[in-house]
């Protein structure tokens, strides 16, 4: 197996040497000033009752925003639904929602972020028929949601829920116990938002008579605080509830609010099996609410139906897994309240059709490949539309299949990464395509024939610009790990690569459960930085090791209870194989990563000191004891149950093995991976009298951005590698 691995790399090395012209070189500033940013369709939404889609447009010269509707068939603009030119009270639009009857628009302005997904905005409701603009509240509110007929808007403000009546313009407060760091109604707490990936924890039923919501009791959740330094004499302190692994989580409960009666009822749930409520969604039956619940270990998921008239629950579906179960938004109810569901219970993520009583009607898709996105169901021809990796785990294609599992058809035709936005009648879709060699483009496609109707947008100008930079190429391959698994990988070599010379190598990875870095899509900012390094004489290699995604549940869940063990082993093994290549300077191999990738790069340098010379860790987890409960326990259970799993693979445990060059970077306002992680590791390294470098960014969060911050950060990392690798 090792011989095959080396031959493969050697094959890459012997590729013809391209003639190098005197062209521009990438600079760090160029990466972050928008030079390489591709054009894209902003805020594209499919309308519900018309064969149209809407787009948020901005006229920079006039400084006006418009919400425009386009015909799916002709791609011609049909009308401007809303323009700030006619409504000067709205200076800018940050987001918008069109209701299900396409006659009202919720418009957000004065955007103010809270955490990763949450924000407050001032919202207006625009009636397309009357052209009347109504301010929902004078306050900056969260997550307003129109009911189906657009007569009422539910929203959250300062941890309480409200209902605004559009006709009377009166507001009813439906909860009163909301309090910061104590009780939240209808909005998720920090850990739900981060790890279950949603903010709005309420939903209207089909006829707008009932509002279901989740209440979060944070009283027993430990407090975390961060100093915000700013420029004042004394720093401010940001205090919020953050449950670390093994600590108390919010106690969640479910409620139903009857609009006509102005009354609320609690829905009784089992506290053990409903430890988490990661999703609520009304079915097509206005009297039936669906609720997904998880136990604390997240290895048993129940789908419940709640009768809103009686408040009684019934368990419709139960899934169990030896490791964990991922929560998705793919649940779709059909007219008869049977439902479409995705699951990896058979080893790969696939689509299933269940009857309304929870009995399996049919497994719709199957095979040793994964469904990666679900687009919708067309009841007219009983067809499901989805995205999958059937053509290889690094690629994405769009497919259709009948509800009974027949007549599967690939709708996308160009290799790479394809995603789709379908017209309301599913007769057309906008295909967003990119690949390692082709910048993003948007094309209108006829669904039935797969025929391309018209190109909507391309990035030919960007590709022309990039020709001036004579970029190296990403070469995709597979590498073997020590047990013979195929690992997806890419290698970037200098454009003037000479197989008779030796080059330093920088490895890049993220490695987190279910993640993917090696994929056939267009470049991101890290790619351009890697190209910059290649222009300076470095080879960059990335390999997705065990635990990463889209290759089946067994490969992804192998790391259960031992995060860092197999992932680190794979990166070290790949580095050792690279060191044997004649074109690699075996004494100059480094590795870097961010977040989970920083956890990995730290561990790789400490545990692989015989092969790694240098590592950069940005915002790393250094002990899973410091990270949040939902994410960590999903893969590790609790530290009380699995102390060795937490400690044996912690960089802090292996800090004494540090021999090479180590640059540790963190932002002090990181609400996700707290700077505590780096501080504890720093303290350990100092205690061990280890030489290392570190860089702290005051008041910067997990993304470490704002102003010139990213430019300064990547300049620092570039110079560090030039000096230390």
Tell me what each language-model feature is.
Residues 15-17:
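N-terminal signal peptide c-region/cleavage motif recognized by signal peptidases
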């Amino acid at each position: 197996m090792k011989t095959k691995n080396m031959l493969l790399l050697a094959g890459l090395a012997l590729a013809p040497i391209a003639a190098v012209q005197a062209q521009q070189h990438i600079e760090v500033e160029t990466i972050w000033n928008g030079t390489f940013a591709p054009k894209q369709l902003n805020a594209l939404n499919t309308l519900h009752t018309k064969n149209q889609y809407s787009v948020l447009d901005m006229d920079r010269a006039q400084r006006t925003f418009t919400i425009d509707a386009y015909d799916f068939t002709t791609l011609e603009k049909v009308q401007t639904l809303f323009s700030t030119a006619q409504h000067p009270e709205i200076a800018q639009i940050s987001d918008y929602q069109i209701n299900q009857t396409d006659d009202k628009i919720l418009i957000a302005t004065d955007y103010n972020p809270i955490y990763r997904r949450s924000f407050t905005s001032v919202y207006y409701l625009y009636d397309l028929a009357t052209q009347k603009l109504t301010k929902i509240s004078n306050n900056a509110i969260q997550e307003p949601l129109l009911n189906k007929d657009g007569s009422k808007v539910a929203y959250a403000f300062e941890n309480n829920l409200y209902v605004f009546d559009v006709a009377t313009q009166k507001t009813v407060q439906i909860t009163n116990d909301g309090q910061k760091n104590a009780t939240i109604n209808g909005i998720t707490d920090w850990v739900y938002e981060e790890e279950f990936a949603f903010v709005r924890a309420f939903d209207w039923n089909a006829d707008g008579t009932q509002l279901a919501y989740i209440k979060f009791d944070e009283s027993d959740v430990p407090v975390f605080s961060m100093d915000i330094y700013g420029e004042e004499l004394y720093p401010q302190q940001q205090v919020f509830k953050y449950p670390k692994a093994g600590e108390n989580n919010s106690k969640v409960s479910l409620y139903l609010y009857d609009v006509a009666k102005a009354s609320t009822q609690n829905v009784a749930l089992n506290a053990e099996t409903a430890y988490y409520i990661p999703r609520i969604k009304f079915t097509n039956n206005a009297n039936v609410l669906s609720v997904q619940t998880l136990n604390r270990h997240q290895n048993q998921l129940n789908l419940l139906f709640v009768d809103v008239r009686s408040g009684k629950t019934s368990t419709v579906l139960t899934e169990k897994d030896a490791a964990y179960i991922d929560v998705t938004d793919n649940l779709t109810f059909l007219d008869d309240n049977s439902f479409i569901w995705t699951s990896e219970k058979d080893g790969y993520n696939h689509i299933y059709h269940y009857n309304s009583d929870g009995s399996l009607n049919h497994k719709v898709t199957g095979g040793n490949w994964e469904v990666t996105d679900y687009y919708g169901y067309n009841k007219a021809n009983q067809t499901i539309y989805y995205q999958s990796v059937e053509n290889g785990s690094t690629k994405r294609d769009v497919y259709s299949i009948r509800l009974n599992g027949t007549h599967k058809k690939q709708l996308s035709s160009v290799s790479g990464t394809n995603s789709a936005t379908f017209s309301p009648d599913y007769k057309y879709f906008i295909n967003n395509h990119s690949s390692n060699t082709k910048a993003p483009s948007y094309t209108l496609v006829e669904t039935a024939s797969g025929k391309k109707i018209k190109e909507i947008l391309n990035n030919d100008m960007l590709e022309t610009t990039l020709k001036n930079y004579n970029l190296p190429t990403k070469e995709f391959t597979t590498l073997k790990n020590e047990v013979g698994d195929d690992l997806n990988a890419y290698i970037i070599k200098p454009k003037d690569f000479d197989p008779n010379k030796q080059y330093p190598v920088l490895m890049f990875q993220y490695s987190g459960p279910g993640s993917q870095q090696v994929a056939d899509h267009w470049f991101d900012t890290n790619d351009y930085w890697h190209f910059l390094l290649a222009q300076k004489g470095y080879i960059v290699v990335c390999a997705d090791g065990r635990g990463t995604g889209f290759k089946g549940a067994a490969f992804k869940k192998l790391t259960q209870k031992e995060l860092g063990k197999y992932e680190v082993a794979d990166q070290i093994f790949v580095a050792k194989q690279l060191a044997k290549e004649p074109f690699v300077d075996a004494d100059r191999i480094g590795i870097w990563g961010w977040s989970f990738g920083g956890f990995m790069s730290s561990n790789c340098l400490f545990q692989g000191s015989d092969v790694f010379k240098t590592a950069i860790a940005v915002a790393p987890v250094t002990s899973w004891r410091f990270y949040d409960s939902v994410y960590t326990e999903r893969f590790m259970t609790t530290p009380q149950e699995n102390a060795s799993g937490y400690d044996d693979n912690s960089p802090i445990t292996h800090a004494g093995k540090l021999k090479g060059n180590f640059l540790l970077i963190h932002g002090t306002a990181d609400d996700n991976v707290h700077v505590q992680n780096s501080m504890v590791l720093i303290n350990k390294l100092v205690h061990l009298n280890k030489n290392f470098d570190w860089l702290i960014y005051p008041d910067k969060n997990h993304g470490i951005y704002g102003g010139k911050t990213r430019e300064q950060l990547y300049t620092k990392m570039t110079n560090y590698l030039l000096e230390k690798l």
